[in-house]
């Protein structure tokens, strides 16, 4: 293992951000694919919030946080057949010697949460 990250957010916080900032908020945080998926759901705000939490958790697991090394939209969360899929720049994964990122996401009526684990190729880390 290299790192673990977790995050929890109130779904209403994402709802308020969207109603305040609209597409500007969406386009800063989420890829077009993420937006399309979330707005195809009956509760898009829960889907957006769980992806927001997942991006935070992934950035913490990698040890970079969101900022200069890793931008919001460089992390893409998509639906896999059995579990969520995480895409981040290959160059960053190579630099950190990360071979894969495991992700678990969940939400209820009020909160969304995610846990990410980054596995390294070199067991000495």
UniProtKB/Swiss-Prot annotation:
What's the protein name? Answer: Holo-[acyl-carrier-protein] synthase
The protein's enzyme class: transferase
The UniProt annotation places Mg(2+) binding at 7, 56
Q: Which UniProt keywords apply?
A: Cytoplasm, Fatty acid biosynthesis, Fatty acid metabolism, Lipid biosynthesis, Lipid metabolism, Magnesium, Metal-binding, Transferase
Matching HAMAP family: AcpS
SUPFAM superfamilies tied to this protein? 4'-phosphopantetheinyl transferase
One Gene Ontology biological process: fatty acid biosynthetic process
Q: Which cofactor does it need?
A: Mg(2+)
EC number assigned by the record: 2.7.8.7
Tell me which Pfam families the record gives.
ACPS
What GO CC annotations are associated with the protein? cytoplasm
Where located? Cytoplasm
Q: Which InterPro entries match?
A: 4-PPantetheinyl_Trfase_dom (IPR008278), 4-PPantetheinyl_Trfase_dom_sf (IPR037143), ACPS (IPR002582), Ppantetheine-prot_Trfase_dom (IPR004568)
GO molecular function per UniProt: holo-[acyl-carrier-protein] synthase activity; magnesium ion binding
Q: What is its main location?
A: cytoplasm
Its UniProt entry gives the catalysed reaction(s) as: apo-[ACP] + CoA = holo-[ACP] + adenosine 3',5'-bisphosphate + H(+)
| Summary of the function given for this chain in its UniProt record | Transfers the 4'-phosphopantetheine moiety from coenzyme A to a Ser of acyl-carrier-protein.
Superkingdom of source: Bacteria
């Amino acid at each position: 293992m290299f790192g673990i990250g977790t995050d929890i957010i109130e779904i209403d916080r994402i709802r308020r951000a969207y109603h305040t900032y609209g597409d500007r908020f969406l386009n800063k945080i989420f890829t077009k694919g993420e937006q399309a998926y979330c707005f195809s759901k009956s509760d898009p705000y829960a889907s957006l919030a769980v992806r927001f939490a997942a991006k935070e958790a992934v950035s913490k697991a990698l040890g970079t946080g969101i900022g200069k090394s890793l931008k919001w939209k460089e992390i893409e969360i998509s639906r896999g057949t059995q579990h969520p899929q995480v895409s981040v720049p290959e160059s960053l994964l190579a630099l950190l010697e990360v071979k894969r990122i495991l992700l678990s996401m969940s939400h209820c009526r009020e909160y969304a949460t995610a846990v990410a684990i980054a596995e390294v190729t070199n067991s000495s880390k």
